[in-house]
């Protein structure tokens, strides 16, 4: 019974913070370094070769490694940094050995008492403060939180100010302001101009509410794409959650303008949706003996796509479950029941996908 009760406490912490189970490797004279990581044996199952499916088919094994460090400069001022890297384990040792390997996070900053923290580097965009509420599925999810896409996911060149508990005056009231520097890359998909975003959230006794918004200039290369118009990209999202008594419920609604990447597989043209409307729902329950079932629904619809009109980008129901043997070892299955029509005008895959994984994390 004691083991079951411990799992009921530890598992939600692991889901919210990927470093909650980190191994402390140094702690001396006000300097602390924690190492964290995981190895995931993972396989996707879809019809045929998976080209017309939600998630593909075959081996998807990967590992991640990261560290978090902090140094106590004085009684009020603390320095900190974090780095995280992804290693694909489904590559050969030949020419494709480095395919998919990437830096996920790399930033450093300072925190001063109740005034807040300021950091710079590769970090999460502030709109993910809202989208993170529903990015909780065993394997899938987070479909609208694209990386290197302005403010909705991990992105480079962001300066972020965060304040917790409103200068120490209101417990649970948090806000953030973020500046996104210009990233003019070789591909329009992962480029962006200068922009500013912000978020505000309030949490009380398991309930949470959040709103976030970001707007940025688009690069010349993005404006030249055949799909998507406008000089500005905008993204916003709201979220509600309940996280208490072993229950997790969350919902997001958001919209984007000239910001969500799309590709027409029939014409081989790419660009951005002029507008999207996104709905994400998730419900989970943590049993004391380690089982955590999950159900979810996600729909992202593009509006006014050139030559097409309105079209679904993502549309599915999810059923899955994770079983935690202890705080370090788990296994899961995640099933996407795809609701995309077989005649989708962008050629988005309409077949289902099942993921089966086993995880060691520390």
UniProtKB/Swiss-Prot annotation:
Q: Which GO terms describe its molecular function?
A: colicin transmembrane transporter activity; disordered domain specific binding; identical protein binding; lipid binding; lipopolysaccharide binding; monoatomic ion channel activity; porin activity
**What residues form the membrane-spanning segments?**
23-28, 30-45, 61-73, 76-88, 105-113, 116-122, 157-163, 172-181, 194-204, 206-217, 233-244, 246-257, 275-287, 290-303, 314-325, 328-337, 353-362
Q: Which CDD domains match?
A: gram_neg_porins
Subcellular location, in the record's words?
Answer: Cell outer membrane
Residues in the Extracellular compartment per record? 46-60, 89-104, 123-156, 182-193, 218-232, 258-274, 304-313, 338-352
Q: What happens biologically when this protein's gene is inactivated, per the record?
A: Leads to decreased susceptibility to a number of hydrophilic antibiotics including ampicillin, cefoxitin and tetracycline. Deletion of ompF confers resistance to colicin E5.
Main subcellular location of this protein, as a coarse class: membrane
> From what superkingdom does this record's organism come?
Bacteria
Q: Which proteins does it associate with, and in what oligomeric form?
A: Homotrimer. Forms mixed heterotrimers with OmpC and with PhoE; other mixed heterotrimers are also probable. (Microbial infection) Trimeric complexes with colicin E3, BtuB and OmpF can be cross-linked and immunoprecipitated.
Q: What is known of its domains?
A: Each subunit of the trimer has a water-filled pore with a narrow, elliptically shaped (7 X 11 Angstroms) selectivity filter which has a solvent accessible area of 30-40 Angstroms(2).
Record's family? Belongs to the Gram-negative porin family.
Report the protein name in the record: Outer membrane porin F
User: Gene name, please?
Assistant: ompF
């Amino acid at each position: 019974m004691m083991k079951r009760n411990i799992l009921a406490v530890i598992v939600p912490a692991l889901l919210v913070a990927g470093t909650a189970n980190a191994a402390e490797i140094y702690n001396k004279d006000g300097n602390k370094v924690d190492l964290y990581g995981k190895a995931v044996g993972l396989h996707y199952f879809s019809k045929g070769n998976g080209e017309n499916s939600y998630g593909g088919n075959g081996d998807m094994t990967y590992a991640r490694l990261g560290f978090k460090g902090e140094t106590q400069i004085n009684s009020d001022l603390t320095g900190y940094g974090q780095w995280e890297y992804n290693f694909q384990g489904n590559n050969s040792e030949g020419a494709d050995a480095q395919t998919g390997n990437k830096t996920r996070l790399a930033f450093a900053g300072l925190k001063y008492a109740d005034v807040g923290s300021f950091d710079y580097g590769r970090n999460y965009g502030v709109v993910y403060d809202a989208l993170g509420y529903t990015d909780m599925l065993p394997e899938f999810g987070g479909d609208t939180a694209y990386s290197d896409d302005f403010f909705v996911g991990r992105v480079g060149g962001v300066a972020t100010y965060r304040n917790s508990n409103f200068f120490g005056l209101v417990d649970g009231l948090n806000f953030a302001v973020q500046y996104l520097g210009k990233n003019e890359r070789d591909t329009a998909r992962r480029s962006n101009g200068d922009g500013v975003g912000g978020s505000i959230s309030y949490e009380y006794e398991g309930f949470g509410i959040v709103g976030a918004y970001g707007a940025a200039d688009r690069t010349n290369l993005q404006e030249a794409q055949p799909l998507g118009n406008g000089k500005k990209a905008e993204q916003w999202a709201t979220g509600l959650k309940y996280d208490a008594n072993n229950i997790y419920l969350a919902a997001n609604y958001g919209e984007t303008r000239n910001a969500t990447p799309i590709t027409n597989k029939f014409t081989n043209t790419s660009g951005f949706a002029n507008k999207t409307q996104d709905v994400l729902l998730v419900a989970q329950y943590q049993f004391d003996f380690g089982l955590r079932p999950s159900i979810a629904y996600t729909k992202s619809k593009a509006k006014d796509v050139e030559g097409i009109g309105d079209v679904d980008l993502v549309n599915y129901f999810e059923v899955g479950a994770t079983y935690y043997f202890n705080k370090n070892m788990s296994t899961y299955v995640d099933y996407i029941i795809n609701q995309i029509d077989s005649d989708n005008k962008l050629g988005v895959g309409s077949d289902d996908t099942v993921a089966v994984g086993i995880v060691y994390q520390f």
